[in-house]
Swiss-Prot record:
Keyword match Cell division: yes
Protein family (similarity comment): Belongs to the SulA family.
Gene3D superfamilies, sorted: P-loop containing nucleotide triphosphate hydrolases (3.40.50.300)
PANTHER family reported in the protein's UniProt record: BLR3025 PROTEIN-RELATED, CELL DIVISION INHIBITOR SULA
Region (FtsZ binding): 106-112
Region (Lon protease binding) residue spans: 162-169
Induction notes from the record: By DNA damage, as part of the SOS response.
Post-translational modification: Is rapidly cleaved and degraded by the Lon protease once DNA damage is repaired.
Keyword presence, DNA damage: yes
Protein name: Cell division inhibitor SulA
Function: Component of the SOS system and an inhibitor of cell division. Accumulation of SulA causes rapid cessation of cell division and the appearance of long, non-septate filaments. In the presence of GTP, binds a polymerization-competent form of FtsZ in a 1:1 ratio, thus inhibiting FtsZ polymerization and therefore preventing it from participating in the assembly of the Z ring. This mechanism prevents the premature segregation of damaged DNA to daughter cells during cell division.
Organism: Citrobacter koseri (strain ATCC BAA-895 / CDC 4225-83 / SGSC4696)
Positions of the record's site feature: Essential for degradation by Lon protease: H169
GN (gene name): sulA
Domain of life: Bacteria
Amino acid sequence: MYTSGYANRSSLFSSTAGSIARVSSENTTAGLISEVVYREDQPMMTQLLLLPLLQQLGQQSRWQLWLTPQQKLSREWVQSAGLPLTKVMQISQLSPCHTLESMIRALRTGNYSVVIGWLADELSEEEHTRLAQAADEGNAMGFIMRPVSAHAHATRHHSGLKIHSNLYH
């Protein structure tokens, strides 16, 4: 999995350890927008990284919103992944311009612990700022999922960011 230079930008999160501590209780989660760039031929890697966080957020009383481009989440997958079926909402077949605006509106409401949206293009600074402000207002997390093909990943050089955690060193 590749993490873009915009990943994990938030004015309220100063350290990885602090982020994990804040996620652990319901009303102390600060707004966060993170971009996850992953290879389309290796979706399991992304699931392994995000599922524990989504499971933890599923313990909150708020919803989880998935804004998917075409695919419909299967009930079986949601249940087998350990996510609360009664708290997962999905809206599919949104165009990219509607996905961004829908994410901003949903994050702002405070009704969702997490909003996950798929976008093919990188966010502009202004778009990221709008998302971050909405996440702060709604005390929610937003994940921008950006798939790349295996071919594009092999032929293109990424100036990425490696995230090291002092929890594991």
